[in-house]
Amino acid sequence: MLVSDFQFDLPDELIARYPMPERSASRLLMLDGNSGETRHGQFRDVLDLLQPGDLLVFNNTRVIPARMFGQKASGGKLEILVERILDDHSVLAHVRASKAPKPGTQILLDNGFSAKMVARHDTLFELHFAGDLPVLDILNQIGHMPLPPYIDRPDENSDKERYQTVYNQRPGAVAAPTAGLHFDEPLLAALREKGVDFAYVTLHVGAGTFQPVRVERLEDHQMHSEYAEVPAEVIAKINATRERGGRVVAVGTTSVRSLETAAQASLKAGKPLSPFFGDTSIFIFPGYQYQLVDVLITNFHLPGSTLIMLVSAFAGYEHVMNAYQEAITSGYRFFSYGDAMFITRQSL
């Protein structure tokens, strides 16, 4: 297949630049992966759609305030977007400047903080921060929430809460696992009371999630790498869910990629399903056979993105593209702060 197969025209006014006042008040488009049938509702309808014994798998990463503004000692301004924290004093980052900094360049930041560019790794720059304060503390003082480019506005105080899931635990993402933004505490409590089980993977979403696919044939695309963890507790819960006839419900494409990475690594090693800790660059597109996920809760994704390809592999290309056109006609809100889908997997 070609990247152009996944393009669609989206009116600018359907790009959500702010979240809904209530998390669970977003709209929900339900898609049956077998029939292609769609239904419309509100996100809190997931309480009726999920059954006792189902397992919700969340990504518990926490978005860090990864964007900083500074200048070189020579006066040139630059913008830094941290991609990954290497240790307490070093990061890998994207740097936007009129001229790329060379190794040894001093970068002056707000509040008297400074960093030095020590090495370049492809498109990323390794920066070392001066002083005793850990990088995460510095970011919490002077960093901005790294809103996606299509939101097209400066970050505001409210984004510190709303561009973050209510169940986040592990700092490290530079983009939110956006399907999880719709869950609020009352909905989570009601799901628990109904008998829906919860499990947590970690995938620190990188800025690469917003990078366009620059080749035309899907097979030629090199996926960006992100760190993921699928602990033993999650494996045990998946096995227990399977035994009782429940469904594994992935909240977001990052949960999907984490779970399917663990499944593929286990298959490759010739072992039963096992925990996974490491980098993943799994690229899921039509033709992929899902191993673990039965239901996907996800937002509406960018035209031509790897994420709409992942969803198309889950529910069938034509079903997904038709559902997207229906969402556009019905005025659904798109992307990170937008509405959601509840999708059952297409049987092969």
Swiss-Prot record:
SUPFAM superfamilies: QueA-like
Gene Ontology biological-process annotations: queuosine biosynthetic process; tRNA wobble guanine modification
Pfam family for this entry, one: Queuosine_synth
Subcellular localization(s) per the UniProt record: Cytoplasm
Molecular function in Gene Ontology: S-adenosylmethionine:tRNA ribosyltransferase-isomerase activity
Keyword S-adenosyl-L-methionine applies: yes
Highest taxon of source: Bacteria
Pathway(s) served: tRNA modification; tRNA-queuosine biosynthesis
Stored Gene3D superfamilies: QueA-like (3.40.1780.10)
The UniProt record lists the keyword Cytoplasm: yes
EC number, UniProt record: 2.4.99.17
Catalytic function, reaction form: 7-aminomethyl-7-carbaguanosine(34) in tRNA + S-adenosyl-L-methionine = epoxyqueuosine(34) in tRNA + adenine + L-methionine + 2 H(+)
Disulfide bridge partners, by residue number: none
Keywords, ordered alphabetically: Cytoplasm, Queuosine biosynthesis, S-adenosyl-L-methionine, Transferase
Similarity comment: Belongs to the QueA family.
Protein purpose: Transfers and isomerizes the ribose moiety from AdoMet to the 7-aminomethyl group of 7-deazaguanine (preQ1-tRNA) to give epoxyqueuosine (oQ-tRNA).
Protein name from the UniProt record: S-adenosylmethionine:tRNA ribosyltransferase-isomerase
Species annotation: Tolumonas auensis (strain DSM 9187 / NBRC 110442 / TA 4)
Classification of source organism: Bacteria, Pseudomonadati, Pseudomonadota, Gammaproteobacteria, Aeromonadales
Gene designation: queA
